[in-house]
């Protein structure tokens, strides 16, 4: 969520920066609600002051023995104030809720270093890394034989999309034998690298979260259609009640679309000691996405699935150091690809292609020879205070005052897409797949997968 104080002080700058993202902020609606909020707040404060003055006046009148009629007249006015104050407080709460609803639909402001642009066509390549020779375009040189895509390579090795479709429908995969082992090896290698070399703390998190958690990280309310909603079977739990014993509404639950949600929420509604920053957290989890807006893209294979595994990196950082942390996290994701000897490039996303909560994002794109193109395998973002403000995540600064942390997240990496990249880049002319050296210890020393 954006800082309401920034909106009040410098609305036009906010509007201009949002416009660079292709977002037209409803200035009229904001001004209407803000004017109403100010008016109601001013009237509330006036009535509160009047209440205090009347209480003092009643005491003075009684103290000097004023006529009863005079005392009663003042008391009558005083007794009418609570109802008026309650109505004003309700109106103020309603207006503030409407303001919050407006702000919750507004994306983060882009950092000054983010290039202007409307779509992915205007993203900027920062660098690329190739483990071998390049062709005339600067892309990895051809393999020297007819390249097959990961589906054709993987199916003889234990990748089964037909069985997955019978079990679950489209956009799922089933793996067995050496293929399942390779998938597991990738995840274990990534976790070991992030924890052992890069200093992240491994976490095991829930795969089901409540709506307030998703609200804090920004998935709700805007991306509700992208989530899998969970319906609980069996008997109900004992109903929760408030302090007065009234039943509370049951909170909706969803499958996580990324463990960014659970890892970032570790600091929800907490105040962290400044000396403890940065926090570096990682987890290997399945991720569940409805792909509601995919429009029939990537229906073949493992590129875009309803269920996929990912090793996530999250940093909770001091605001003064968060952009150093962003570059560090990009390097952590790059190192995975380098050790796997997979060609990749780093792209700085333009204003029109960034995610909802991001102030600055880098995408890592891996080379897929069968598609003759680069495909995203990691996205690393600095959300600054956008998530922290929604979830009330703070730290104590040098003055011992609470201040919002900066939250960062990134894939380190998407396991399924890494498997796709290994199958395509490490395939051999006879249909076998060379196991990258860094994965061989996780494969019991196996160097080649053979049909």
Swiss-Prot record:
One of its GO terms (molecular function) is serine-tRNA ligase activity. Gene3D superfamilies: Bira Bifunctional Protein, Domain 2, Serine-tRNA synthetase, tRNA binding domain. Keywords: Aminoacyl-tRNA synthetase, ATP-binding, Cytoplasm, Ligase, Nucleotide-binding, Protein biosynthesis. It is found in: Cytoplasm. Consists of two distinct domains, a catalytic core and a N-terminal extension that is involved in tRNA binding. PROSITE patterns: AA_TRNA_LIGASE_II. Disulfide bonds: none annotated. Belongs to the class-II aminoacyl-tRNA synthetase family. Type-1 seryl-tRNA synthetase subfamily. GO terms for cellular component: cytoplasm. GO terms for biological process: selenocysteine biosynthetic process; seryl-tRNA aminoacylation. Catalyzes the attachment of serine to tRNA(Ser). Is also able to aminoacylate tRNA(Sec) with serine, to form the misacylated tRNA L-seryl-tRNA(Sec), which will be further converted into selenocysteinyl-tRNA(Sec). Pathway: Aminoacyl-tRNA biosynthesis; selenocysteinyl-tRNA(Sec) biosynthesis; L-seryl-tRNA(Sec) from L-serine and tRNA(Sec): step 1/1. This is Serine--tRNA ligase. It catalyses: tRNA(Ser) + L-serine + ATP = L-seryl-tRNA(Ser) + AMP + diphosphate + H(+); tRNA(Sec) + L-serine + ATP = L-seryl-tRNA(Sec) + AMP + diphosphate + H(+). InterPro entries: aa-tRNA-synt_IIb, aa-tRNA-synth_II, aa-tRNA-synth_II/BPL/LPL, Ser-tRNA-ligase_type_1, Ser-tRNA-synth_1_N, SerRS_1_N_sf, SerRS_core, tRNA-bd_arm. L-serine binds at residues 258-260, 312, 411. It comes from the Bacteria. ATP binds at residues 289-291, 376-379. Homodimer. The tRNA molecule binds across the dimer. Its EC number is 6.1.1.11.
């Amino acid at each position: 969520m954006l800082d309401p104080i920034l909106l009040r002080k410098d609305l036009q700058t906010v509007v201009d920066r949002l416009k660079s993202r292709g977002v037209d902020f409803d200035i009229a609606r904001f001004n209407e609600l803000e004017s109403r909020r100010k008016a109601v707040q001013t009237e509330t404060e006036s009535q509160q002051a009047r209440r205090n003055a009347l209480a003092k006046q009643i005491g003075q009148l009684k103290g000097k023995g004023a006529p009863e009629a005079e005392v009663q007249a003042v008391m009558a006015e005083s007794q009418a104030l609570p109802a008026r104050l309650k109505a004003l407080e309700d109106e103020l709460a309603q207006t503030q809720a409407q303001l919050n609803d407006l702000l919750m639909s507004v994306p983060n402001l882009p950092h000054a270093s983010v290039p202007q642009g409307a779509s992915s066509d205007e993203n900027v390549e920062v660098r690329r890394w190739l483990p071998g020779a390049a062709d005339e375009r600067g892309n990895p040189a051809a393999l020297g034989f007819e390249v097959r895509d990961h589906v054709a390579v993987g199916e003889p090795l234990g990748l089964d999309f037909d069985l997955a479709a019978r079990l679950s429908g489209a956009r799922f995969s089933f793996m067995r034998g050496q293929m399942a082992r390779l998938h597991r090896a990738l995840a274990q290698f990534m976790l070991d690298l992030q924890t052992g070399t890069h200093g992240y703390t491994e976490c095991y998190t829930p795969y089901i979260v409540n709506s307030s958690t998703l609200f804090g990280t920004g998935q709700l309310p805007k991306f509700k259609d992208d989530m899998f909603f969970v319906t609980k079977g069996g008997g109900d739990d004992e109903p929760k009640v408030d302090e007065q014993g009234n039943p509370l509404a049951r909170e909706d639950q969803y499958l996580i679309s990324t463990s960014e949600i659970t890892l970032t929420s570790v600091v929800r509604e907490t105040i962290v000691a400044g000396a403890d920053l940065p926090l570096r957290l990682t987890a290997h989890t399945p991720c569940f996405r409805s792909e509601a807006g995919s429009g029939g893209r990537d229906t073949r294979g493992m590129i875009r699935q309803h269920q996929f595994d990912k090793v996530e990196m999250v940093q909770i950082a001091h605001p003064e150091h968060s952009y150093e942390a962003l570059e560090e996290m990009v390097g952590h994701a790059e190192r995975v690809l380098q050790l796997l000897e997979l060609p990749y490039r780093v792209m700085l996303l333009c204003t029109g292609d960034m995610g909802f909560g991001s102030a600055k994002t880098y995408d890592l794109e891996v080379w897929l020879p069968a598609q003759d193109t680069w495909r995203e395998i990691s996205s690393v973002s600095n959300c600054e205070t956008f998530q922290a403000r929604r979830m009330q995540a703070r730290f104590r600064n040098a003055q011992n005052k609470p201040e919002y942390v900066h939250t960062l997240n990134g894939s380190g990496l998407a396991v399924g897409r890494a498997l796709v990249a290994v199958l395509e880049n490490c395939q051999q002319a006879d249909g076998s797949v060379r196991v990258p050296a860094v994965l061989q210890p996780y494969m019991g020393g196996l160097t080649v997968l053979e049909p």
